[in-house]
């Protein structure tokens, strides 16, 4: 009910929806899916996503912990086709706590794989005056990135939101043409997995 505080408590799940968070009265199509290998059950709060007025507290219990480092766990939204995407969350005493903005399908996943950094047209960097990297992370996405040229901070940005490439426009006052230069790029994903690569250009 939209005008009451709603509680949903099941084994391994706790959801509190404060009064006024739902736009209307809704009858949830709730179900739990269990796979013996999963870190947590998959909880379908509703078969189609229902947006809420604001974020609400969701807690999902872990059934097992295959990875000791608790920062590698995250609450994942689950698509109709079974794909997972990162919502976030924090581990505390066997439970993942997160705030959600819609009633959909959720579970807990783990990400221990660092991002992949690929230089784009590296042989042309010195000539074009542009250093370009493609940074990808399959599970939790790119969270932070930092680049240096010859040990000094270099500003990288994402001028094209479609490609998502990291681009640095070289400043001739700071980067001398013709000499050999070393670029170091560090990329971190949503669970703190980090990749650092060193690349040279002339």
Task: State each model region's role.
Residues 10, 20-24, 67-70, 102, ...:
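Short proline/glycine-enriched turn/loop motifs at strand-loop junctions of beta-rich domains
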Residues 112-116:
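Proline-centered linker/hinge motifs at extracellular inter-domain junctions
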Residues 88, 95-98, 138-202:
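Long, low-complexity serine/threonine/glycine- and acidic-rich segments characteristic of extracellular
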Residues 28-74:
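Proteolytic processing hotspots in large secreted/extracellular or virion-associated proteins
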Residues 104, 129, 179-183:
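Exposed beta-strand face motif in extracellular beta-rich ectodomains
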Residues 40-42, 80-90, 152-158:
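Surface-exposed loop/edge segments in extracytoplasmic proteins
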Residues 18, 59-63, 130-138:
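Short edge beta-strand/loop segments characteristic of extracellular beta-sandwich folds
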Residues 49-52, 123-128:
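Short, solvent-exposed loop/linker segments at the N-terminal edge
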């Amino acid at each position: 009910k939209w005008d009451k505080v709603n509680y949903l408590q099941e084994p391994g799940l706790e959801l509190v929806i404060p009064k006024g968070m739902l736009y209307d009265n809704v009858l949830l199509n709730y179900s739990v899916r269990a796979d013996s290998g999963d870190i947590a059950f998959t909880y379908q709060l509703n078969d189609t996503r229902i947006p809420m007025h604001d974020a609400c507290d969701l807690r999902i219990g872990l059934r097992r912990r295959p990875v000791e480092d608790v920062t590698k766990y995250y609450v994942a939204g689950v698509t109709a086709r079974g794909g997972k995407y990162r919502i976030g969350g924090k581990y505390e005493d066997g439970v993942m706590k997160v705030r959600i903005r819609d009633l959909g399908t959720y579970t807990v996943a783990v990400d221990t794989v660092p991002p992949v950094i690929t230089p784009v047209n590296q042989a042309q960097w010195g000539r074009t005056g542009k250093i370009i990297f493609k940074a990808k992370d399959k599970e939790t996405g790119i969270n932070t990135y930092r680049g240096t040229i010859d040990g000094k901070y270099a500003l990288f940005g994402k001028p094209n939101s479609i490609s998502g490439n990291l681009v640095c426009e070289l400043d001739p006052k700071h980067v001398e043409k013709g000499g050999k230069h070393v670029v170091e790029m560090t990329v971190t994903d949503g669970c703190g997995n980090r990749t650092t690569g060193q690349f040279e250009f002339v």
